[in-house]
Amino acid sequence: MIEASSSLKLTVAHEFQRPVARERITYLLNYWSERFGVQNEWHGDRVFLSGKVWGVEIRAVFTVLEKSVIAIANDPRTMLASAAQGYVYKKLRKYLHPTYEEP
């Protein structure tokens, strides 16, 4: 469970129908699974993520809405927190960009 007082929150807009946005998020999740071993589990329009990236425990929830994706993650309380937030924001923007195509 992610506590609101110790969490990072991002909102990234998109222009897709919800199923298409979910599919694009799945591309990103597949990449993170292959690269870092991050696990994910979908429940409707929400996906729960867990694992370790660069030795830092990650727990997050992404919620796919009609015009945006909201990402809430535990705050790792390390010097990497700001970099991690920026990384996730850039990845979400990339995969939700209208011209992005999965290779």
Regions found by a protein language model. Give the residues of each.
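Short, charged/polar low-complexity linear motifs in solvent-exposed/disordered segments
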Residues: N40-E41, E66-S68, P76, V88-K90, ...
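Beta-strand elements of well-folded, non-transmembrane domains
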Residues: V12-R18, V53-G55, V64-E66, A73-R77, ...
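Ser/Thr-rich, low-complexity intrinsically disordered terminal regions
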Residues: E23-I70
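Terminal, regulation- and interaction-focused segments at domain boundaries
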Residues: M1-V38
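A conserved amphipathic terminal alpha-helix motif
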Residues: L80-P103
